[in-house]
């Protein structure tokens, strides 16, 4: 269905949500919180068979943590489990040679090549190492990485291609040492022995260089660095290396107690450090010529704005010294930011550089001959650069770069050819998951163009032109092009449909569903369909998208108690049309409606899917705009859905737990009860990467931390609070809730309780814990919202 066609139905004043059919058993709390195996497994990942005749996908095995591989033909037929023997001839996600004759893939850490004409499979490696980063070159050769080293295959033999090492070269000149020089001058035997060693070394190296059967010598970066990452050109000529200072201090890490163990003794795990204890270590970028071993550092001086300090005012106010020289940077290496991308011909390489202060991102190319950077694009954000939408790459012509940028306020796709820049997508919607066609003439990508909550596969010409929506599935998760480029394997979902597979022509058109892994029991339930709503903002935020759950036919004159749900992560979208991350909570909301509540789940400011300004609304003051949005949502429920303002509750986990604390502490009396699950109560206790983006460094911006941390406002608690937290949570430490507990004790607060879960981490995995937690939440609401 198309969202545009449904807009009036979905957003009409009368709710489209319905109560359960009396003939259908109402979901119980035990069932909602049970092991989700009863629902049926979601399609975890999917990829094409090498000839495009079938799709492989992964499903969790019932009653186990094992993921089995299944196969389904694209022309129909029942899905089948891939046998143990069948797995030996199965390709995983492959990279296709430039000419389209062969593909390469990694299975169980080993490298394989498939002839796409004959189907012949050739195994290139057989070891216990883990290969990664496969790439073809224009000569039909293949390169890949294993650990720090690189390997190549030229069609005949697998050979070492490059070996970066964090040590000094054997012929490196030693530091000046007067005593050593004195000894060599006086003792001729010492000098003669030294000369012989050097002559042997030089001769050995000369023989190595003259012998094409020998691998290149290791590339020495020096003993004062630690190698973070490296990237080899497809032709094997050049190696980019990312380093940091040896022994760089990452800050004091935590020791997290584990109380319930197999050994019977309390144990301790190493855990992360806290925000601001030490900034991420600055990194350097080097260019090495593989054949000669010559290494040159790539200077960052040329980057526009590299010496500017966006935090100068805060630094001055905090009494800190002004920033001197270049701002410290980190190099994209495939974690939060993509690794360097080489063109297939090996002549071009692009790299993402990101300022440690989170305010700038540079896309650069490298002049390989002169070992200099060439700035191609700078993205600056007064708040912080998004950790999403940093994708980039090359088109097959080897000279056109593509990249994503939020510079317009929304993530969009751009191309760069020389100095000519073109914007391929535009509008108040987001572009993501970009895949160029194999011939480089088109881009395929996800877009939420029809509505922020509706995700489809779209395409556009690489030269610019109209954007087309190729699917009409509303909840596309991801997709992959067929080996021939004529079809799309689409993973999609819906409110009560875990991710499934469908097939769509690459030109668009109707889809054909290939899988439905839901159980008969789950499908038999007549679930309450969420109503996708737009809540008017009274605080200049336009509208706030959300999901409303309520009775199909409200009783005239009746006021309904209210429950408001707050999703986690902050930057996450939960009011979209996908299968929710919070599927258990969605079933709980069904139960709440059956018990007489109405429920609203909002994508508050800070959520994903609504552009840069929505994302950064919380900069330097987490909790303020989100609470405004929830109070607007409360007003809307009272005005539009017979909500009882005097009997409203709120709950959520992680960021949702933080917001529950914020609501109860800073808006006392608005919510009569709240359940804060695994909450952040003090942002000084959270990690650096997430927190410093939004609140800066605590030494520079202490006010941002004070006004954003609920523990600072705990004196405001007057309503009923449940805190629930896993004791081995290595994301939001259980200690955070312990400190809040102590603060509430010191403040002589009552009407609160804490429930610890000794064997749970940030995301609960045991059904018993889920049930206990949500039984407590349900009892909290029943006791305080219906009186």
Q: Would you name each region that the model predicts?
A:
Residues 17, 55-56, 150, 376, ...:
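Intrinsically disordered, low-complexity N-terminal regions enriched in serine/proline/glycine
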Residues 3-4, 614:
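Extended, C-terminal/distal alpha-helical "rod" segments
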Residues 476-787:
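Serine-hydrolase catalytic core recognition
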Residues 5-13, 19-478, 486-487, 495-499, ...:
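Beta-propeller folds
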């Amino acid at each position: 269905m198309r969202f545009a066609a449904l807009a009036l139905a979905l957003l009409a004043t009368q709710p489209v949500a319905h109560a359960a059919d009396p003939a259908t058993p109402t979901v119980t709390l035990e069932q909602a919180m049970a092991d989700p195996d009863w629902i049926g497994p979601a399609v975890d990942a999917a990829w094409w068979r090498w000839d495009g005749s079938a799709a492989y996908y992964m499903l969790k095995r019932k009653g186990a943590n094992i993921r089995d591989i299944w196969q389904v033909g694209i022309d129909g037929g029942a899905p089948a489990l891939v046998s143990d023997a069948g797995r030996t001839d199965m390709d995983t996600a492959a990279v296709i040679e430039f000419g389209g004759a062969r593909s390469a893939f990694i299975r169980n850490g080993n490298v394989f090549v498939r002839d796409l004409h004959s189907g012949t499979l050739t195994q290139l490696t057989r070891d216990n190492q883990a290969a990664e980063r496969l790439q073809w070159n224009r000569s039909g050769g293949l390169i890949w990485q294993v650990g720090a080293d690189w390997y190549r295959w030229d069609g005949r033999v697998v050979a070492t291609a490059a070996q970066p090492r964090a040590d000094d070269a054997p012929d490196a000149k030693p530091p000046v040492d007067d005593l050593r020089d004195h000894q060599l001058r006086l003792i001729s035997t010492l000098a003669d022995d030294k000369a012989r060693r050097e002559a042997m070394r030089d001769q050995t190296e000369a023989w190595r260089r003259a012998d094409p059967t020998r691998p290149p010598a290791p590339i020495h970066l020096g003993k004062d660095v630690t190698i973070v990452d490296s990237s080899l050109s497809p032709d094997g000529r050049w190696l980019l290396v990312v380093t940091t200072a040896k022994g760089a201090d990452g800050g004091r890490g935590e020791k997290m107690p584990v109380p319930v163990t197999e050994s019977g003794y309390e144990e301790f795990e190493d855990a992360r450090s806290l925000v601001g204890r030490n900034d991420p270590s600055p990194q350097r970028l080097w260019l090495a010529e593989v054949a000669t071993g010559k290494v040159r550092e790539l200077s960052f001086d040329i980057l526009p704005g590299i010496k500017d300090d966006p935090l100068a005012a805060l630094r001055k106010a905090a009494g800190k010294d002004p920033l001197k020289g270049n701002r410290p940077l980190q190099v994209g290496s495939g974690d939060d930011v993509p690794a360097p991308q080489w063109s297939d011909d090996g002549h071009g390489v692009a790299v993402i550089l990101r300022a440690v202060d989170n305010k700038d991102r540079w896309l650069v190319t490298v002049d390989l001959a002169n070992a200099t950077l060439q700035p191609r694009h700078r993205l600056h954000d007064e708040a912080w650069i998004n950790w999403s939408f940093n994708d980039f790459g090359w088109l097959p012509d080897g000279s056109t770069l593509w990249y994503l940028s939020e510079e317009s306020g929304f993530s969009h796709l751009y191309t760069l050819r020389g100095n000519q820049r073109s914007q391929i997508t535009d509008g108040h919607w987001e572009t993501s998951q970009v895949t160029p066609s194999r011939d480089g003439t088109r881009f395929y990508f996800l877009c939420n163009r029809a509505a922020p909550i509706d995700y489809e596969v779209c395409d556009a010409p690489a030269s610019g032109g109209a954007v087309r929506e190729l699917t009409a599935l509303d909840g596309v998760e991801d997709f992959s092009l067929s080996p021939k480029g004529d079809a799309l394997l689409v993973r999609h979902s819906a409110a009560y449909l875990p991710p499934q597979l469908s097939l769509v022509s690459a030109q668009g058109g109707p889809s054909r569903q290939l899988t439905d892994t839901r159980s008969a029991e789950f499908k038999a339930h007549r679930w309450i369909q969420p109503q996708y709503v737009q809540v008017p903002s009274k605080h200049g935020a336009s509208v706030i998208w959300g999901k409303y759950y309520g009775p199909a036919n409200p009783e005239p004159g009746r006021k309904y108690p209210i429950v408001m749900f707050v999703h986690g992560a902050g930057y996450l979208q939960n009011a979209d049309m996908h299968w929710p991350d919070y599927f258990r909570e969605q079933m709980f909301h069904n139960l709440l409606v059956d018990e007489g509540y109405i429920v609203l789940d909002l994508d508050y400011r800070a959520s994903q899917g609504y552009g840069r300004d929505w994302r950064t609304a919380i900069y330097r003051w987490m909790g303020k705009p989100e609470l405004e949005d929830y109070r607007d949502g409360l007003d809307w429920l009272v005005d539009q859905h017979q909500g009882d303002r005097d009997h409203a509750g709120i709950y959520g986990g992680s960021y949702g737990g933080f917001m529950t604390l914020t609501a109860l502490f800073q808006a006392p009396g608005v919510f009569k009860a709240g359940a804060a699950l695994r909450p952040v109560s003090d942002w000084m206790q959270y990690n650096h990467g997430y927190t410093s983006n939004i609140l800066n460094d605590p030494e520079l911006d202490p006010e941002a931390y004070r006004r954003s941390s609920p523990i600072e406002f705990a004196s405001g608690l007057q309503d009923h609070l449940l805190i629930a937290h896993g004791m081995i949570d290595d994301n939001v430490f259980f200690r955070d809730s312990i400190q809040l507990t102590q603060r509430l004790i010191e403040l002589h607060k009552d009407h609160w309780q804490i429930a610890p879960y000794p064997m749970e981490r940030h995301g609960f995995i045991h059904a018993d814990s889920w049930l206990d937690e949500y039984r407590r939440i349900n009892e909290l609401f029943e006791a305080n919202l219906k009186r």
